[in-house]
Design a protein with these regions (language model features):
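Glycine-rich beta-strand-to-loop/alpha-helix junction loops that act as flexible
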Residues: 84-90, 122
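Short hydrophobic-acidic sequence motifs that mark active-site Asp/Glu residues
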Residues: 22-24, 82, 142, 180
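Short strand->helix junction
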Residues: 32, 90-91
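Canonical Radical SAM [4Fe-4S] cluster-binding loop centered on the CxxxCxxC motif
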Residues: 18-61
């Protein structure tokens, strides 16, 4: 098992399958993982295997390191297409997430005004007013909804604490369309149980929830790197294309990453 722990607070730039040339912003510790999910497919590994000893970067550290990197990229003539909050876990867990978003937008406007600001989140903190308001300010508010099946969520995403999918859907609807839904589709088994969510019994109710949320876009994808759990398999091109086409037929733009 090979997993990735990203530098903090800035990493890359990297080429994102979904976003282009992406400069990563990691609000989590540089030596471990902090997440409200513990997904069996996470490229950063299981939470218990990567407990951090370092603190989260401060708001000031993030701003200083981001400005330093943007100055360097400008001098090199290679500005990013997108500034992406991702990294070792859930970015909205940071206590100063909202303020860091404001700082990032200001630096973006100064150094690379054509770049987008994106946040990749698992949707668990969107009940916090300051998180919701901050996500309304970013260009790409990319929020996870892997399924609407509670058993599947607990089996695959392993949320910490209470996670009620109906409540999450209502909170996603509260963005009034300023949201991109991101969903992982995969096949295979984990601990002797199927984790295949590509079948109609999973896709149909998920699509109904997506219609209710009415996002600006849906991004579906599959496993791209090694996973901490064994026995997982990529969804096929044909499966992803079929799901994508159903979303598009519902009037919602959709991309598939293989």
């Amino acid at each position: 098992m090979s997993t990735i722990i990203y530098p903090s607070p800035i990493f890359g730039p990297v080429h994102s399958r979904r976003l282009g040339i992406s400069l990563g912003i990691n609000l989590l510790p540089a030596d471990g993982k902090v997440c409200s999910f513990d997904c069996i497919y996470c490229e950063c590994g299981f939470n218990e295997d990567h407990r951090p000893t370092l603190p989260m970067p401060t708001r000031q550290e993030v701003a200083e390191k981001l400005e330093e990197k943007l100055k360097q990229m400008a001098a090199d003539g290679q500005l990013p297409d997108v500034l992406t909050f991702a990294g070792n876990g859930e970015p909205t867990c940071h206590p100063h997430f909202a303020e860091i978003i404001d700082d990032t937008i200001s630096l973006r406007n100064q150094y690379c005004p054509s770049a987008k600001v994106s946040v990749l989140s698992n949707s668990t903190m969107i009940h916090r007013p300051q998180v919701h308001d901050a996500l309304m300010k970013v260009d790409n508010n990319i929020l996870k909804l892997d399924t609407v099946d509670p058993i599947y969520i607990n089996k695959v995403d392993h949320p910490n604490g209470t996670y009620d999918v109906e409540t999450i859907i209502e909170r996603l609807k509260a963005f009034n369309g300023h949201v991109i839904i991101q969903t992982m589709f995969m096949r295979g088994e984990c601990k002797g149980e199927s984790v295949d969510n590509t079948g109609e019994e999973y896709v149909a109710p998920w699509l109904e929830a997506v219609k209710q949320i009415a996002p600006q876009m849906v991004m579906i994808y599959t496993i791209d790197r090694e996973t901490p759990a064994q026995g997982l398999q990529k969804a096929t091109h044909e499966q992803l294309d079929a799901i994508r086409d159903k979303v598009i037929a519902a009037g919602i733009p959709c991309t598939a990453s293989y």
